[in-house]
């Protein structure tokens, strides 16, 4: 499954909640919709900076689970709580390499036809919006993490 999402999107947070605990292989792709969510790109870059210290999923989960606190002080608090080197985190977050990683994900979404977040691709089929009960059931019954 490939998931395109935006960390400020409330529908993405709901999708995250529904998919938590599913034993399916997930490829996450950043799709910051900055026209609606001005901090989305900064948050995506923070997740990629955390990834460089081995904490991608931890930062990812933290942002979706508490969208009410996405401002810089809370972002640093999260990084500290995850045990990240804060100087390195900040340097990486502002780096060209991290910005390019986020932009590459976004461009891949455009090429794939993503127009809204979240959008899931399961077995090549696009599923825009919050996943349906049927899709969640299908993902929940996947064997060995694959469909």
Residue ranges: model-predicted function:
Residues 2-80, 90, 147:
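Structural alpha/beta surface segment adjacent to cysteine/selenocysteine redox centers
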Residues 3-5, 11, 16-21, 77-147:
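C-terminal cap of thioredoxin/glutaredoxin-like
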């Amino acid at each position: 499954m490939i998931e395109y999402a935006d960390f400020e999107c409330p529908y993405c947070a709901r999708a995250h909640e529904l998919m938590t605990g599913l034993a399916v292989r997930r490829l996450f792709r950043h799709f910051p919709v900055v026209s609606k969510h001005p901090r989305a790109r900064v948050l995506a870059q923070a997740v990629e900076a955390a990834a460089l210290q081995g904490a991608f999923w931890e930062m990812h989960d933290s942002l979706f689970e508490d969208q009410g606190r996405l401002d810089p002080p809370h972002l640093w608090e999260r990084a500290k709580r995850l045990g990240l080197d804060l100087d390195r985190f900040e340097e990486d977050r502002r780096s060209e390499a991290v910005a390019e990683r986020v932009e590459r994900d976004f461009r891949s979404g455009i090429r794939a036809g993503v127009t809204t977040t979240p959008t899931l691709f399961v077995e090549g089929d696009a599923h825009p919006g919050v996943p349906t009960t049927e899709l969640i059931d299908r993902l929940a019954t996947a064997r060995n993490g694959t469909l």
